[in-house]
Amino acid sequence: MAETIAGSNLSWGYQSSNESYACFSTNGSCPYAAARVLGGCTVHNGMVYLRGNPTDYNNWAAMGNEGWTWDEVKPFFLKAEDNGEIDRVGRFWHSTGGPLSVERFPYEPPFANAMLEAAEQAGFRISQDFNGDVLSGFGMVQSTTKNGVRRSSAASYLRPSRNRENLHVSLNSTVTRVIIEDGKAVGVEYFKNGEFKIVRTTREVILSAGNIKSPHILLLSGIGPQEHLESMGIAVVKDLPGVGSNYHDHVFFMLNFTINDPDTYENNWAAANEYLAFQTGPLSGHGITGIVAQLASSKTTPDYPDMQIYNIGYDAACAPGEIGALRSTGERSVDLASVLLHPKSRGRISLASNDPFEQPLIWSNILSEPSDLDILVEAINSAIKLTNTDAMRAYNMTLSVTAL
């Protein structure tokens, strides 16, 4: 889904620039996925349900963000959740009755279980629930799905409430700035059907446009570094040097592997009919996306993992048309993404101009801190370590190597 949206009019099409430590094969520019749809990235992401590490929340609270300790935010996670496997995961960490459906994918291919077996053979711990008390290891995670169907934030929250009199959703609209009067946010300006419009509020404005668009809107609204705003011809409402700075994001490196597997195509007409009728079978899963690793590098402890491995592929291919068609080669492809969870490198979001429709300048500055690269290499080696197990040798899991 993410690859389908990328490059289309359903994507913001963000690109970083002037990268000195990464993105060498693309002239110092890397793409940043962001869905331009109602529901945002929950419409195209991998649906994996991970709340984040409690230490992260406690660290944010220690920075002065009142109300953000793990003990303070946990009740809101529980309030949001409708866990379809509550008897398995327990009510201390999970709950039912909320708007967001959470459960494992109904279908996992045999290779997914083989990966867990390989993880054990490689010496990694197995976690039954990364949202519980075992925060590191390999595990089969829950997802934001219900009966094999994606549940985006729009489907979970907006669709059930769309007939409420106090809810108005403006589609095909782009917010261009927050309106500030006498030091208070009183509304927003937005563009729709070829014209700028304004909506006002009597209470508050909540800006929740993501880690790129939120600072972009603030800068366009005159909130940010004074010198930068003045250079763009924008009236300064509030001189806040921090707006747009301290940018950081998860860095990942994708490894492609081939495996020899003579199974039949999963995505055939029989699978389609099963999914349409019962929301079960191969199409109710997401390949090996349900297998995730949260690992601790040599620079941290198991209760605060700084590396992640998430997996893509295995059953993405489709049959030629006839039911039960066999693969011609028996060779499949899987991707293991090694992720840096707590990067120290910092970049910046800034304006290219005062035109709200011109993309902001994104300088991620990823891998500028040597320790980030060290940890990323550890994550890559952890992924490769899986191949040196009996469970993966049975699949002849082989790293694809492309000469530079």
Task: Label the model's feature ranges.
Residues M1-L404:
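N-terminal redox-cofactor-binding region of secreted/periplasmic oxidoreductases
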